[in-house]
């Protein structure tokens, strides 16, 4: 687990790697949603949105990114990670919620 540094969310986001944390969480999340035994139609649609985040030119100039998607679907993500007992990802999700959402 990485060492927590002092952050300054409300003024500058100083010390917060929001994009990096979001990318790390998506990698953890993909361990679950890429598993055919764990996915469903909701997560398949979520993966389509992740693809759009990776290529904004294909989304009619609408900018999506991992942090936006995490914020938009935070409760669904919590439910999935709790269901599969992924404590490491839950800890990171909570950190993202506190620091960046």
Curated annotation (Swiss-Prot):
Gene Ontology biological-process annotations: nitrogen fixation
Pfam families the record matches: CowN
Record-linked InterPro entries: CowN
Domain of life: Bacteria
Function of the molecule: Is required to sustain N(2)-dependent growth in the presence of low levels of carbon monoxide (CO). Probably acts by protecting the N(2) fixation ability of the nitrogenase complex, which is inactivated in the presence of CO.
Family statement drawn from the similarity comment of this UniProt entry: Belongs to the CowN family.
Name the record gives this protein: N(2)-fixation sustaining protein CowN
Gene field: cowN
């Amino acid at each position: 687990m990485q060492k927590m540094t002092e952050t300054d969310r409300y003024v500058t986001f100083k010390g917060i790697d929001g994009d990096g944390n979001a990318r790390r969480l998506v990698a953890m999340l993909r361990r679950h949603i890429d598993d055919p035994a764990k996915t469903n139609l909701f997560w398949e649609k979520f993966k389509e949105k992740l693809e759009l985040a990776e290529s904004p030119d294909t989304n009619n100039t609408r900018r999506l990114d991992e942090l936006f998607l995490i914020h938009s679907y935070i409760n669904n993500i919590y439910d999935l990670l709790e269901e599969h007992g992924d404590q490491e990802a839950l800890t990171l999700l909570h950190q993202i919620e506190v620091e960046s959402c």
